[in-house]
Amino acid sequence: MALPTAAGVISSGLAAYPAIYYDRVALETLRSNLFLYPACDLKQMPDKSGVAMQIFDYSALQANTVAATEGAPNGNGVTLTQNVRTLTLSNYVDYVSFSNKVVLTAISDTVAEGAAELAYRGALTVDTVISTLLDSVANGDASCRIDVNDGSYMSAAKSRQAQMSLRSVNVKPKANGSFYGVLPSVMAFDLINDSSTGGFIDLFKYTDSQKANLEVPASNRIGIVGGVEWFESNALPTETNWQTTSHTAYHAYVIGKNGLIASSLGKTQLAQKNFAVKVSKFDTPIAVDPANQIAAAASYNFFFGVVQRTGSTNGFRRIRSESSIG
């Protein structure tokens, strides 16, 4: 018996043949790294204490070069000047709700996935509140602004300028001895690609690339350049029509000790209860949903506030620059 020249059963002839396989694991969401919150010095607001915290410091005393007169007390001495600022907490709330059909029939754990996306939204909200404050203060204080000229880019020299500008007004570095810097990826490229004398490449050309962090690791820590420890984040503001109509300005920030003061209610760390995403499952009907069609929800509800340091001397610098690749 001769064999057939073609198969009698092929996929197109089967009505129940699966045309598509649905992967049950979502690809990783393209989220920005968020590094502004760690730049803040945290103050704890106790529960049942209102939503406003007054912080203060003292103005530094000046030298007294007048020699004392023998036997004559020096008048009334000196007075102390306190500088105060009010940190007000705001309430941030959001949620995602899920139908019973989604919970019962979806091929992946949509509730857990939604909670993860909502957690990022909450964290991004905090970083955005911080960058909005930084820009608002910098727009009103020329000493905070370092603007790179059209046709020039982020460099090690600008990192040193930001550090020394802060040191010149007696702003101290963070506890690790470095100022804290956050910049977007396109500015980070220009920084680590700076081949000028004294630039990033020149500084580290005789250093092992891993030890010098020339190869940016998954932690998105660029390294310490000019006394600033730089981290990479793309959740930072931009400006269109920068100096010329075809260019975009990117914002980077360098922050010193007490440059930003932040607070929340009760707990102050992102991993603690104040910033937790709550997942609720509704197993019984309620008045507004008598048919129990909403089966689950993910939500956050937290308080957060941030202010610049007290007094007229700000403890941060903003660098605005276009990028050679952006």
Show where each model-derived region lies.
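N-terminal "assembly arms/tails" that initiate or stabilize quaternary assembly
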Residues: 1-88, 313
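Sequence/fold signature of self-assembling virion shell proteins
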Residues: 2-39, 151-161, 193-326
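Disorder-to-helix initiation segments
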Residues: 7-14, 100-107, 111
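Short, solvent-exposed loop/turn elements at domain surfaces
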Residues: 62-66, 190-191, 240
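Short acidic, glycine/tyrosine-flanked loop/strand segments centered on an H-E-D-like triad
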Residues: 79-106, 271, 278
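Alpha-helical scaffold segments that mediate packing/assembly in large oligomeric complexes
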Residues: 105-174, 185-192, 324-326
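Polar-ligand-bearing catalytic/cofactor-coordination segments
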Residues: 181
